[in-house]
């Protein structure tokens, strides 16, 4: 049990544990023991029986009855139809059983008509009357047959009456008589019959169930709405009350958008009136028998006020069912011949089922011509026009295979056809377009509005403002006018006819004004010039007249939509082929399609996998046919599920629903549910309203029950629903008096319990629940609460999360549904409890001491308040005088005069004392994180943090990397810097798997630009890892093992370090092969005579024309680079000598480079000098070195000076140079050599730069093996290698001299003797002497220590084992536990484990003993700022070795990410390349890849375009955007776009101005040399005039003032500090500042928005710090944030943390 909820038991509405809820059981009061069962229904039944037996059955009976009755009805349905229910049909039944009316918007084949017919029979068998209304006579006949078939199959005796035009006269009379006498249980008629016969035949009748099939036909007579309401049982009086509510709500919307002073008063008055009327309607419904109504439609266009009567009286709104989903492959073809021939080819390749659309500019004449051409070629094709009314019918019955018609929005071929089983593809003979003469003859309203939008960017500022007003006015006026009425208005303008309707006359006036405006601006030559240059609009001149062509996007969407329809198995796939007849209009079409559909892509037709696409198209058509014939398989039925998606905010619910079309709406209590089809789901979307539960205040310790469980305390939070007073705004949890606000006494209180009841209501109806609360810990906790309280009502609940509210993101999230993350929930539980405990205790103390109930405190608030107070103190103490000078060149400088500057006189001239000018490259800033956005919004927009978060939320609803010098280990033994490994795409890495060494494949290489903080993790062995805060490391903490992000690693942790992995290098070289590897090919190779004459000479004669070939032939030599270039691969065995063509260069043989050679390399690495061709070694005794060199290079003369020994050979000198012997990097190939060669090299290094000695400490003589060098990079590589072969060591740097030491650990001395000692020559005796002294007093102790004492303490041993271990092994294990470090020798632990009993702890310890890693303690963690490249891999094992440590790859992430996904980069690419040019685009992923992404726009739409698209209705948002919304969007948009742009180059200037009385330093830029990202944002530097050293400038104006040197903080500054100091979280930054201001501890200055502490704030802070310093300190607060992160990562036990917090608080409370 993790928590207790009050009033959440599904049976008694009492308190219940989360455990019981998740088990789908009632509380312990209702049922002692939980009940288990295999299926959901079995569980519901078993619980009901158990409750009944116990006598506690209450509300559970309703759950049972709903499930049981649904099953009974489904059994009856199976008997009556032979089919089982679709998931959606099961949902509809449950709604009916609950007595709810609703609208069904479902695709073809979902069984709407069958369902209506079946439910009418079911109602009839219950003695109830039903009425089915269908659109046409054929459908009346079809429905009657359907009902008769159901009656026959079910053996049901039901009276059926119907009326249609095909009845004979006598039948009509008899049927009419039956209807008048109510001699029926079921009545079926057309909608038209209802309209004509209601008054005479049906008036005063009552139906229990009305099913309307096809809303469009029903609403042609809008009075049918009133008629249906009367038939359901409503009266004139009640319908009038509903009309009054509609009127009042319209009035409310006017006040909501207004700014009148008495606005709130008027709104409250309207609310009271509406609520009174609603209560009267509900009272009527309860007292009277009101029927149920279902309106069903695949599509619909319900408009106007009358349809709203259903909302007010029946609680639902009719949606259009119009789907915004497309499954179309959009392709284009650029014509290379006559378009007719292209169309013929396409029809031949694609087959039957094609629609051919001809653009309006080509005309109907061309369509006829094309139809005739194709008919002559043998295609069965029909032209769809007003003359050929049978064309569609012929296509449907198979007489025609293709249809051709005009590409116009209201054309029959574009809108009037819905045949998903027949239509497969669409071909466009040109781009669908609008074509206007600039004189605008016979304009239409929508085309005029479209044209106005397109040209708005080209108008003057004044004209643009007028255009925006006209556009907004006309769009607002026509919003609810049906299309046929708009046609009358358009005709009236064209013909000059009058209009009787006064409102329509007003619309006509605005339309006329708009047309005249367009005609005027289109005669402006400047506007025409700009239009001609635009890449998205076509301007053409024909017969002396100008025409504008713009894309007709609506027609393209509608026309291609014919090929892709929603049906009961998803969305059929379609294909569109567009022949491009106008490049500009085509570009415009693609751009506008991308604005509407982010996932839209237009692909060249020739690149399509046509066979695969056609296979998928035909597969879908077969499914549709099966569905239509009722033969669909159960498998497909299972694909279409009814689902409930729960989001937090109503805006988000509305936005998501609108992504998929126009949803139907249902009101459940105060909540609105949106229903829409998304192909494989009938989705109901509901908003929870955010947090619904909080800790109670009147139980346990501030809402937490504390129980003793053995040695531990258990903490159980008690939750109740949140309440909010609508009158005073007070939010609370506990009732003092039920239903009454404890603050103001109002009964107008909203309880979140109502939300829970509404959600439970819908949860019972669906097959699955998808909880889509926000993707953070708070959202996870809300999801957990929702999961818990809904679990008893449904069998399937999943969590989904999306990080941007876009259609693709939502569909992806649904596919990737998961369970609730318990670790994230645990972290949020702890965060809330800690906040409550600290807050309540400190707040009560403050209220007592200061005698004020408006005081509060929190752990995070307090240090933040302290920062503001401290800055205010600095501010008040730092006042000095300043002198502001304006110079003759316009430059303004400020001189600080100090505290005594009052009487200083300004100078007449100033002198430019220093000037530094240089070209600099400026990289853009990364995209916004939450804190950076809040800071900039505060600084530049003067917005408060809470306001910014609210604006951002409205907008949102509508690096795992290391530094370049990090060493990575490759699978072949090589060690190199990660930068080189990434750049060279080194694919095989060394990693660990199950703590054993394993080869890993690099799947992806990352190079990321970074400008931000890095964590520097310093290890006890001298290594350090510099990484982004979210980079993961394998860490051991208190015996627990796990991945920890760098920001959460702390001092005292142990990091996994590769150890004893063995060396995998196998490489051996000859001198020649090594030279080739190192790229040394400017060397002459002498070959033996036979090989040269046979293989080489013929090629020399053929390929070399210069005289040098004779030299080559005579001497039998050839440059090495030619041998390589010519591909001769068998020459090495025939090499006689190698030499360089320079004076004094002697030939040397090619020889094998064995251990002796690499030992010499080690000598040179340590103490060598490379001077041209000379190799010199400074080492004593020189004789020893000389003998080594003579041994290795017998063909060279070795010479000796007073302090050096060496030889001269340019080849070997160059080899040593390229290997990195004296400078540069040590070549990675060194560590790919055989182990004995590397060990010989290290021995050589020790023999020069090493020393072996004895250091006496308090324990006696101590052995010291040290290698000393200034080359820390080389020692780091050697250190990593030595660890891998089992030799522990540590690095140390003398900060004074910069010299590094590599010190061999005495715990690896024997391993050093085994591996390195055999190759020592010069210092062997020194080693022997020190070793013998050391071993004389110290016994050998080999191996590493494991920090596992906490785990070891949990092992179980049989009695007496301790003594047995001591006797048999000499190990006293119990002493290990006494060590503060808790470290245990690996070799001894291995022996002791043999005596332990089997347990998980034993297995864990065994895995550590056998592991290829050791554990190195973290000495400290620091942070540093870094600008530059970072690198990473994605690997098959999800880890790699960085600086020896085990590093995670590409998974860790947080909401404060700068990462940009590929989708985000594509958004930037599209905008930048189209608007600015391809040269400005430079993609950057920035931070790490993970769950979250940086704050960015979801579409390539800038602020101006966004305003236009919203104005045009193309983008529909759930709320109106304000000026501040647009300002914030613009800031986010520009920051993101610039983050993906090329660097800018500036002329940077830094100068010192001497004014005599003081100096001023200036820094800025003189000019932008290359603009780059500065096209969109200004550089973050001041613009300066160009200055020259010594220049004297006259002062033209001087001003003196006194002001503080230190600036007060803004809200943005505080948020940046919180981020920097790790106080708070992105989601709480704004709330913390808001709380401080709300409590009156801090105020904000009006103009500059600076934060000032109040007297109250200062007093409260000083009191808290004086009494509770450690409790509210910055350090403790930061530590707790890290603990929360560890809980979230599953490393820390949340109950243990709560115990520690409780103890901490109790110490202060009791004190």
UniProtKB/Swiss-Prot annotation:
ATP binds at residues 89, 106-113. It catalyses: ATP + H2O = ADP + phosphate + H(+). Residues 1160-1287 form the DOD-type homing endonuclease domain. Zn(2+) 2 binds at residues 725, 728, 741, 744. Its EC number is 5.6.2.-. Disruption phenotype: Grows up until 90 degrees Celsius; does not grow during 49 hours at 93 degrees Celsius. Temperature sensitive growth at 85 but not 93 degrees Celsius. Loss of ATP-dependent DNA-relaxing activity, no longer positively supercoils negatively supercoiled plasmid DNA in the presence of ATP. The keyword Cell membrane does not apply. It is an enzyme of class 5 (isomerase). GO terms for biological process: DNA topological change; intein-mediated protein splicing. Residues 93-256 form the Helicase ATP-binding domain. Introduction of positive supercoils requires the cooperation of both domains. The helicase-like domain probably does not directly unwind DNA, but more likely acts by driving ATP-dependent conformational changes within the whole enzyme. A beta hairpin in the 'latch' region of the N-terminal domain plays a regulatory role in the enzyme, repressing topoisomerase activity in the absence of ATP and preventing the enzyme from acting as an ATP-independent relaxing enzyme; it also helps to coordinate nucleotide hydrolysis by the ATPase domain with the supercoiling activity of the topoisomerase domain. This enzyme is the only unique feature of hyperthermophilic bacteria/archaea known and seems to be essential for adaptation to life at high temperatures. It may play a role in stabilization of DNA at high temperatures. This is Reverse gyrase. It comes from Thermococcus kodakarensis (strain ATCC BAA-918 / JCM 12380 / KOD1). The gene is rgy.
